[in-house]
Structures are given as structure tokens and as C-alpha cells.
């Protein structure tokens, strides 16, 4: 889980637009966030395995 201070800091508009970054909407993780879903890879995998994301399933070949 991300620190609450870092989540609050990321929510503010940065002085320069290039300094903005995405965070996971569920856990607040700053790295490996999928833009299409707005969540990180950890939460994406967990939710996909539980069947909470429609149209997404684990690949098997």
C-alpha cells in the first residue's frame, strides 16, 4: 500500500505537466499502471482471476 501522503501529493496538480504520473485507483501503487483500466498489474491480476473484469481471462495455451 502506498503512503497516504504520497497519494495526496500525486492528487495535486503538478507545477509542470510532465511531472504528473498515474497511480493505481485501488492501492495507490505508482508503477506498472495500465492506462486502459487505471489499476496496477497486481490489482489487475487479482481482479481478473476473481472474474471482476468483464472480457478479461487468463491465457492458456
From Swiss-Prot:
One biological process term from GO is: translation
Write down the superkingdom of origin: Bacteria
Classification via Gene3D superfamilies = 30s Ribosomal Protein S14, Chain N
Q: Give UniProt keywords alphabetically.
A: Metal-binding, Ribonucleoprotein, Ribosomal protein, RNA-binding, rRNA-binding, Zinc
Q: Which terms in the GO cellular component ontology are assigned?
A: cytoplasm; small ribosomal subunit
Q: How is the cofactor bound?
A: Binds 1 zinc ion per subunit.
In its UniProt record, a GO molecular function of this protein is: zinc ion binding
Q: Where is the signal peptide?
A: none
Which cofactors, by name?
Zn(2+)
Q: Which residues bind Zn(2+)?
A: 24, 27, 40, 43
What family does the entry list? Answer: Belongs to the universal ribosomal protein uS14 family. Zinc-binding uS14 subfamily.
Q: Which HAMAP family match?
A: Ribosomal_uS14_2_B
What is the role of this chain?
A: Binds 16S rRNA, required for the assembly of 30S particles and may also be responsible for determining the conformation of the 16S rRNA at the A site.
Quaternary structure and partners: Part of the 30S ribosomal subunit. Contacts proteins S3 and S10.
Q: What is this protein called?
A: Small ribosomal subunit protein uS14
Organism, by scientific name, is Campylobacter lari (strain RM2100 / D67 / ATCC BAA-1060)
The gene for this chain is: rpsZ
